Amino acid sequence: MVRRLVAGFGGLVLLLSTALGFLVVAMRSKSPRMLGVVRRFNRGFTNKIQMRTAGTPGAWASVIRHRGRRTGTIYETPVVPFESGAGYLIALPYGTNADWVKNVLAAGSAELVCDGRAIAIDSPEVVSADAITELLPKREQRTQRMFGVDQCLRVRRAMETASV
């Protein structure tokens, strides 16, 4: 019985280590094929789980509401923004190819839901992660280095609106 538990636990650790290794290699290599796998997994699984609490008080992730470039449909995507001066910095692990990034850049504005508050944001600009790294918490700096994140989206606070 104990052997089975140890073997099962060892198998689980191996599986999780392999998945994390793939994720790190995919993100650092910027291989379109590997990033596509990660993006599809996140869109179909991880994002759905994060969206259950994203944007609520105390949640790790926030929500960015953005309008589709072609359809005009409002979409919601979980993001992890960091306050910086008059706005926020959001890491772009997939670069500027993520649909939400393209939508925000095209519209020039969006809405960020953080801690239960909807905040209008505008003036989006892509900045080098190197240029803003000192503005991020140390833990986030390590995470960005590990995953090879080299771009961030800087947005400005337009005005704060009522609680969501």
What name fits each language-model region?
Residues M1-A59, V63-E76, G87, N103-S109, ...:
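Short amphipathic, positively biased membrane-proximal segments
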Residues T73-T77, R117-A120:
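Short beta-strand segments
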Residues I74-E76, V80-G85, L89-W100:
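Mid-length scaffold segments of soluble, non-membrane domains
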Residues G95-T161:
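Short, structured beta-strand-loop surface elements
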